[in-house]
Design a protein with these regions (language model features):
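Histidine-dependent nucleotide/RNA phosphoesterase domain, centered on the 2H-phosphoesterase fold
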Residues: 2-201
């Protein structure tokens, strides 16, 4: 009887645009204020782990990760670097029933949406599922714990809707990163697999 080939290692992975240090620093003060008011109801994302997700792929074979990385420069070479900034705060699905807290974005959102679509198409051409949801660019800050009351949800929504940045940073998006995620008891940790320059080069 022929022995079955060992299952290929699976890697939890996603494609994202990195957020520079000044963007992370501007969010830090807001998250600290959030934490003082509603922290016991929210699991916060590590600040160093905040990123602008273009495509979440989940657990995929290691060989597929290599193929995605090989194709990524072809996608990003079709675009030019563009401006993006942090603007406003909100929650999914809404501020009345907040479950995911986020920072919003402004800038050249048309180019951002085009890159996201091109990335999704490229990944789909490799045989991975294409995104079914509308692309809503954001930076995830935290996730509301399940054991909260309606009153606590209302308070969370009110705190988030009133938040403002002292400085609204903007930057030039010039790279798209392929990342892998490792899960531990403290949450998720993200590691760079490879990067592709927007505009080529």
């Amino acid at each position: 009887m022929t022995q079955t080939r060992q299952t290929e290692k699976q890697i939890r992975s996603f494609i994202a645009i990195p957020v520079p240090d000044e963007g992370i620093q501007s969010l830090q003060a807001v998250v600290q204020d959030f934490d003082a008011d509603i922290g016991r109801h929210v699991r916060w994302v590590r600040l160093e782990g905040i990123h602008l997700t273009l495509k979440f792929m989940g657990n995929i074979p290691a060989g597929m990760v290599d193929r995605v990385l090989a194709d990524l420069p072809t996608v990003t070479a079709k675009f030019s670097p563009f401006k993006v900034g942090i603007f406003g705060f909100g929650a999914f699905p809404n501020l009345h029933q907040p479950r995911v807290l986020w920072a919003g974005l402004d800038g050249d959102l048309a180019t951002l949406a085009s890159i996201q679509l091109a990335v999704d198409d490229a990944v789909g051409n490799l045989g991975l599922p294409k995104e079914q949801r509308y692309f809503s660019p954001h930076l995830t800050l935290g996730r509301v714990r399940r054991e909260v009351t309606d009153g606590q949800l209302r308070k969370i929504g009110a705190v988030v809707s009133a938040a403002k940045l002292a400085v609204s940073p903007s930057w030039t998006a010039s790279a798209v990163n392929l990342m892998r995620t490792e899960l531990d008891l403290a949450g998720s940790r993200h590691y760079l697999v490879g990067s592709a320059t927007i505009g080529g080069g």
